Structures are given as structure tokens and as C-alpha cells.
Curated annotation (Swiss-Prot):
PANTHER family: BINDING OXIDOREDUCTASE, PUTATIVE (AFU_ORTHOLOGUE AFUA_2G08260)-RELATED (PTHR43656:SF2)
Pathway named in the protein's UniProt entry: Mycotoxin biosynthesis
InterPro entries found in the cross-reference section: Aldolase_TIM (IPR013785), NADH_flavin_oxidoreductase (IPR051799), OxRdtase_FMN_N (IPR001155)
Chain coiled-coil ranges: none
Taxonomic source organism: Talaromyces variabilis
Lineage: Eukaryota, Fungi, Dikarya, Ascomycota, Pezizomycotina
Name by which UniProt lists this protein: NADH-dependent flavin oxidoreductase iccG
């Protein structure tokens, strides 16, 4: 069994990873009361994934500012805690992630207007749209409200916080970071003309909207070793029209030239959560419907524009054959696996790369949780996504109980 999926890949920073099947980031809520990692449940879970045979293990979302959380239990970097204490907790986390030589990177993020139950900040004072009608409006007003437009000083502060978090990850022993610029979080809000109405240096054109991301990449690069990996997660579903696609390609060229090591393609926001639900049958191209992955068509459309930049697609892969086909067709260089990695944490080692498992049985299982009746009645997709996310969080937090089942 000679799989392209099993071949090593060398990133721009010089790191060589043993295969092209990577465990993608998910919401995990492993933070303690000080927003630190390091609980036994957290470390045990990552020891399991580290022994699973993944080419790379990505951690769950880490927020760069504890005042704005993407999820209530997220790990975050609190500058009021002595750095030695924070670094000790992160080193224990990195060690757990790196068992048996595994490589791990930290996903770093700021939720922007998707921070709940606080006066959130965003590039512009544009609120979330959870759907038509009074009930979605009431829910949005209660949970998210209308964000406050950031000052330039606040933008500079966020850039600094991303760089400081990356430096912390490097000092702790992680192999790199992934900048989260997808799923409707702060950086995706800046990149999108729909949520960024600024007319200063950080808005008004595709290039200006990408400036905060470019500044973050440069700030990180100036503060970490050259061999430290810096990847980025990018939305596909924000770029449906010809103008949006043109802007997208301009931004991706700028991001690639700034010095990232890989680009992960995902999609969706709290308004339209395709990262959980996939692309709707009505909107999906026929070619997308016949493939497993949600975002392969977008990946193929940008492939020729980004020569030399490793491309990762996450979302929808469920079989060895589907994963291998994506690589053979040159749709991507890397396959990202999220929820199946919870139900089958040893998926690469025990199933996908196991010669004794035939293709028909080489399946990445995922559990689909029914949308609550109230969510269907209200017509708010985000509620259904939330129910499924909570189900998987509980599974993740109990994953360490199988640590000895090697």
C-alpha cells in the first residue's frame, strides 16, 4: 500500500513531517480557572493523539486575550500571570503533545465580534446576523450585541498579543502556531468587506483589509526561530462572487509572500456554520457533492495561484480513498481530520496506514448530532452547531481515559 497520504512533507520553515494526515484543531475547553492548560485530562488527551500516528497535531483554539473568548473554556494567554508560571504549564502541554517524537502546533485566535456576553470588539460596528425574524435578533442582542469598532492602538495591541502567544508556544517547545483567520473570528472579520467597513490603513481595499494579518505574520516571524512553523487557517465560503474571489486571491498572495508555511482551507462562520454542517446541497457544485471534502473546489480554484505553498483541506473526509484521491488529483497537499480524530484518535496508525485494513473498511467515523427542535423552530443554525460542539467537547475531555489502550 503506497499512499501519497503516507509520504513526508517538508514545510518552508524546514520542518519535515512524517505524513500528510493531520489532526485539525477543535473546540476543547481545557482551560483551568487561570486559563492555563495542564490539567491531567488535557495532558492525557494530547498524549493519546501524540501516539496516534498523525503527521501533525494541532491544538484547540487558544485565545490571545482572556478578555475575549471564543468559547468559555478556552485556554488563553493572561499577561497578569507571571510568565514563568504560564510557561511551566505550556511546557507540560507541549511535552504531552510531543510524545514519541510527534510534532504539535498551537492554533491562536481572537474571536472579535463572536465573543459572547461581553462588549466585543471588531474592525467595524457590524453585528452578527443569526437569521431573519425577532427571535434570532433577540438571541444575537443577548449573547453578542453590537461590537465596538477597534481603534488603531487596539489593533496594534492585538498584533502584539498574537506575537507574544507565538513566542510563548516556541519557548514551551511547540513546533509552531496556526493563525486562525477563518470561521468568522476577528481576522476573518478584517479580511471580509462585509464586516470591515474601515477607511483607514486597515480597511477600504482587499490589501488594506489583510494588513492586520500580514502585520501579525511579520511580528511573529521577527520573534521566533526560523524553523518555527507559522500556518494560517482561511475561509473558503467568504468568497463566492467574482469580486470576492479576486479580493481573496490578492489577500492570499500577500499572506503567502509574508512567510507562512502552510494554508489550511476551511469555511463558515457563526452566521453560516459550514465548518460543521458542510456546504448545502443547494449551493454545492456537483463536483463538490461527489467528493467527500467540503472545500475541495475552492482549494482547486486557488491551487495554481499559490505554487509552493502547502495546502491543507479540512472538513468532510471520511475514507482512505477519499483522502488519497484529493492528493492524487492535486487538490491539496495535506488532509485535515477533526471530529473523526475524537472517535478514532489512533486513526492514522490503526486504520488509514494499516496495511491489514482494506479500503472498504478504512473509514473515519464521525457522529452527527441531531439539531435541537428549538433550533429548527427558530431557524438558527448556530444553535444546532452548538449542540454538536458540546457533545464532542465532552468526548474530547474523556479521551485520556483510553491512554493505556495502545
Amino acid at each position: 500500500m503506497d499512499l501519497n497520504l503516507a509520504k513526508p512533507i517538508t514545510l518552508r520553515c524546514g520542518i519535515t513531517l512524517p505524513n500528510r494526515l493531520w489532526k485539525a484543531a477543535m473546540t476543547e475547553e481545557f482551560a483551568d480557572k487561570r486559563r492555563l492548560p495542564g490539567s491531567e485530562a488535557c495532558l492525557a488527551t494530547y498524549r493519546v493523539w501524540a501516539n496516534g500516528g498523525w503527521g501533525l497535531v494541532m491544538t484547540g483554539n487558544v485565545d490571545v486575550d482572556p478578555a475575549y473568548l471564543g468559547s468559555p473554556g478556552n485556554i488563553a494567554v493572561d499577561s497578569s500571570i507571571p510568565r514563568e508560571k504560564t510557561l511551566a504549564a505550556w511546557r507540560a502541554w507541549a511535552e504531552a503533545c510531543s510524545q514519541n517524537g510527534a510534532k504539535a502546533i498551537v492554533q491562536i485566535n481572537h474571536p472579535g465580534r463572536q465573543a459572547s456576553f461581553t462588549k466585543s470588539i471588531a474592525p467595524s460596528a457590524v453585528p452578527l446576523n443569526l437569521g431573519p425574524g425577532i427571535l434570532p435578533w433577540m438571541l444575537r442582542s443577548l449573547i453578542y450585541g453590537t461590537p465596538r469598532e477597534m481603534t488603531v492602538d487596539e489593533i496594534h495591541d492585538v498584533i502584539m498579543k498574537f506575537a507574544e502567544t507565538a513566542r510563548l508556544a516556541a519557548d514551551a517547545g511547540f513546533a509552531g502556531v496556526e493563525i486562525h483567520a477563518a470561521h468568522g473570528y476577528l481576522l476573518a472579520q478584517f479580511l471580509s468587506a462585509a464586516s470591515n467597513k474601515r477607511t483607514d490603513a486597515y480597511g477600504g481595499s482587499a490589501k488594506a483589509r489583510a494588513k492586520i494579518v500580514i502585520d501579525i505574520i511579520h511580528a511573529i516571524r521577527s520573534d521566533v526561530p526560523k524553523t518555527f512553523c507559522v500556518g494560517i487557517k482561511f475561509n473558503s465560503t467568504d468568497h463566492q462572487s467574482e469580486t470576492e474571489m479576486k479580493d481573496c486571491l490578492e489577500q492570499l498572495h500577500l499572506i503567502s509572500d509574508a512567510g507562512v508555511d502552510f494554508l489550511e482551507i476551511s469555511g463558515g462562520t457563526f452566521e453560516n456554520p459550514t465548518f460543521n454542517l458542510g456546504v448545502s446541497d443547494q449551493k454545492a457544485k456537483v463536483s463538490t457533492q461527489t467528493r467527500e471534502a467540503f472545500f475541495v473546489d475552492f482549494a482547486k480554484s486557488i491551487r495554481s495561484e499559490l505554487s509552493g505553498l502547502p495546502l491543507m483541506v479540512t472538513g468532510g473526509f471520511r475514507t482512505r480513498q477519499g483522502m488519497e484521491t484529493a492528493l492524487v488529483e492535486d487538490s491539496c497537499d495535506v488532509v485535515g481530520i477533526a471530529r473523526p480524530a475524537v472517535l478514532s484518535p489512533y486513526l492514522p496508525r490503526n486504520i488509514i496506514f494499516n496495511r491489514d485494513v482494506v479500503d472498504a473498511e478504512a473509514i473515519a467515523h464521525a457522529e452527527k448530532i441531531d439539531t435541537p427542535t428549538i433550533a429548527k423552530w427558530m431557524g438558527i443554525k448556530a444553535i444546532g452547531v452548538g449542540a454538536e460542539t458540546i457533545w464532542y467537547i465532552k468526548k474530547i475531555q474523556n479521551l485520556g481515559s483510553i491512554e493505556t489502550e495502545l
